[in-house]
């Protein structure tokens, strides 16, 4: 992440130097560059979740999935490059959250019940609640398919301002990991987990989540009038939401969300 920030800083300095040379030569390229943008505001809703790519064998069924208030508000700037091609940069404020209830078998867990931490393989049901607030900067190449339709694709970087990953394991049993045994060994002490508070095992992995995320964002804008339009997109995280050393959940969990919304041209 430091290399990316440093690269962006060097690019900005180089662009500023280029603009300064042109101004000194009597041109106004920098002013033309700044005023050659069109600005857009948009509001939308994310539909998706945080999940591994490919369902692991230890997750047997999905009991329920609940939508959350995953709103996104942002401002984008578009700059024409050549012909139908252009560049889009933006600043987005996002919520990415989900709540799932899944049936698992032989699923590695670390939980707390009655103040005691337990680790082992669990068979039963697991509720997972994920909630992330993010500030996202997308950088996209745009192509105007027609005067009313614009396609966009490119990378994004997000800073996670608040994050939660918590839940509980219930209605099942945990084979407790014995000292010196592999964490997947299903022969340890059997600990029964019930349905209600005090009977189930809780977990909270919020402190193990990353502060920065990177991914790919693709989408399309369709303008119904000169200023108003509809938008749709897909953001796919390329970095997992947890730090690389976190191994309680063995599958890498990626934020994968589709977006629908409306867009308004400000200028």
Regions found by a protein language model. Give the residues of each.
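Outer-membrane beta-barrel channels and translocator barrels
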Residues: 34, 80-82, 146, 225-227, ...
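Cleavable N-terminal export/targeting peptides
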Residues: 1-34, 267
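Extracellular/periplasm-exposed beta-strand and loop segments of Gram-negative cell-envelope proteins
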Residues: 49-68, 96-133, 160-213, 240-257
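Outer-membrane beta-barrel "beta-signal"
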Residues: 222-223, 254-267
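Repeated loop/turn-to-beta-strand initiation elements of outer-membrane beta-barrel proteins
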Residues: 84-87, 148-151, 226-232
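Hydrophobic, lipid-facing positions within transmembrane beta-strands of outer-membrane proteins
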Residues: 37-39, 69-75, 135-139, 214-218, ...
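Residue-level signature of outer-membrane beta-barrel architecture
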Residues: 77-79, 95, 143, 159, ...
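Membrane-embedded beta-strand positions of outer-membrane beta-barrel proteins
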Residues: 39-43, 89-91, 139, 153, ...
């Amino acid at each position: 992440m430091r290399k990316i920030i440093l690269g962006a800083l060097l690019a900005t300095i180089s662009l500023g130097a280029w603009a300064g040379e042109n101004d000194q030569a009597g041109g106004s390229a920098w002013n033309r560059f700044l005023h050659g943008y069109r600005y857009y505001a948009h509001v939308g809703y994310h539909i998706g979740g945080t999940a591994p790519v490919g369902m692991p064998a230890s997750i047997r069924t999905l009991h329920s999935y609940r939508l959350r208030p995953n709103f996104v508000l942002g401002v984008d700037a578009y700059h024409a490059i050549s012909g139908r091609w252009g560049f889009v940069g933006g600043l987005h404020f996002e919520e990415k959250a989900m709540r799932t209830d899944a049936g698992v078998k032989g699923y590695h867990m670390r939980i707390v019940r009655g103040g005691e931490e337990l680790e082992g393989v669990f068979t039963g049901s697991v509720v997972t609640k994920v909630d992330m607030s993010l500030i996202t900067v997308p950088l996209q190449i745009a192509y105007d398919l027609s005067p009313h339709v614009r396609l966009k694709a490119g990378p994004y970087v997000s800073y996670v301002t608040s994050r939660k990953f918590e839940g509980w394991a219930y209605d099942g049993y945990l084979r407790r990991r014995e000292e010196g045994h592999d964490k997947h060994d299903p022969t340890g002490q059997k600990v029964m987990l019930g349905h209600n508070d005090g009977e189930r095992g809780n977990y909270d992995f919020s402190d193990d989540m990353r502060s920065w995320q990177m991914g790919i964002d693709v989408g399309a804008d369709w303008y119904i009038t000169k200023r108003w339009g509809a938008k749709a997109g897909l953001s796919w995280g390329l970095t997992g939401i947890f730090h690389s050393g976190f191994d309680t959940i063995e599958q890498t969990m990626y934020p994968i969300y589709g977006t629908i919304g409306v867009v308004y041209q400000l200028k």
